[in-house]
Amino acid sequence: MKKIAVDAMGGDYAPQAIVEGVNQALSDFSDIEVQLYGDEAKIKQYLTATERVSIIHTDEKIDSDDEPTRAIRNKKNASMVLAAKAVKDGEADAVLSAGNTGALLAAGFFIVGRIKNIDRPGLMSTLPTVDGKGFDMLDLGANAENTAQHLHQYAVLGSFYAKNVRGIAQPRVGLLNNGTESSKGDPLRKETYELLVADESLNFIGNVEARDLMNGVADVVVADGFTGNAVLKSIEGTAMGIMGLLKTAITGGGLRAKLGALLLKDSLRGLKKQLNYSDIGGAVLFGVKAPVVKTHGSSDAKAVYSTIRQIRTMLETDVVAQTAREFSGE
């Protein structure tokens, strides 16, 4: 049985969206058990599942504006902290939260703990491409500064994930840069490039540019945390902007525009789904001793369900243990 500790109080629509996503996951997956951490009375309002689920009550939670490290240290009974401790103590196999991203990263670093020989765990997510296959990118902001050695480790981690969780036999690894030529980039990118070229275990395809990411140029894209987070926000903003422009054009375009939208309804719905990567799951703090997964703060029940499905696959493929063995040299 795969045991998942869930912070029921994190996120914009908690606990309703969290619990409703859990209900659906428990209905569809008979091999998971969920521990819900949070306000028992509020959780029970939405919990319909009766088997393989338990509630661990706490009145304390971490708010979105709390300073991450201080919150983890001072709010020892917060729902997120208790969920992370359950993983550390072996009572759960993975932790899921839609709450404060920085606090969850801190919980991953300081409570769950790093895998031996991994210097800086990275935040990784699967982002959308026009062909619907997506690509994995890390680091998306777990670290403000990185070395070339960190980025090399991210390439190995991302390749492991793409192989074991997404089923890609030979993931194409690209280094995010300001040009595709091998001579491009600052000293960090140039040093990283040399490390990736020298690692024969990687299917390294060279430098990739941000404009090509959504065309599926690579299966795994490596970046420092600052750049990766900026690209993530740009993709999110572009997706929202496109949908907003379409909506404005349709609503303000008169009868002909509305009729055209009606004819294109299925295509527009498909476009919206393609740009909405919540179906794929959450962002993984990769490089810690167990799956620590952050779903978007605005996640609905469907996104929570998708993230639980993602965690289930990670546990099923034992990707974290395989990563630990790889980096420990066993």
UniProtKB/Swiss-Prot annotation:
It is an enzyme of class 2 (transferase). GO terms for molecular function: phosphate:acyl-[acyl carrier protein] acyltransferase activity. One of its GO terms (cellular component) is cytoplasm. Its EC number is 2.3.1.274. It catalyses: a fatty acyl-[ACP] + phosphate = an acyl phosphate + holo-[ACP]. Keywords: Cytoplasm, Lipid biosynthesis, Lipid metabolism, Phospholipid biosynthesis, Phospholipid metabolism, Transferase. The keyword Cytoplasm applies. One of its GO terms (biological process) is fatty acid biosynthetic process. Its main location: cytoplasm. It comes from the Bacteria. Pathway: Lipid metabolism; phospholipid metabolism. The keyword Nucleotide-binding does not apply. It is found in: Cytoplasm. Belongs to the PlsX family. Catalyzes the reversible formation of acyl-phosphate (acyl-PO(4)) from acyl-[acyl-carrier-protein] (acyl-ACP). This enzyme utilizes acyl-ACP as fatty acyl donor, but not acyl-CoA. HAMAP family: PlsX. Homodimer. Probably interacts with PlsY. This is Phosphate acyltransferase.
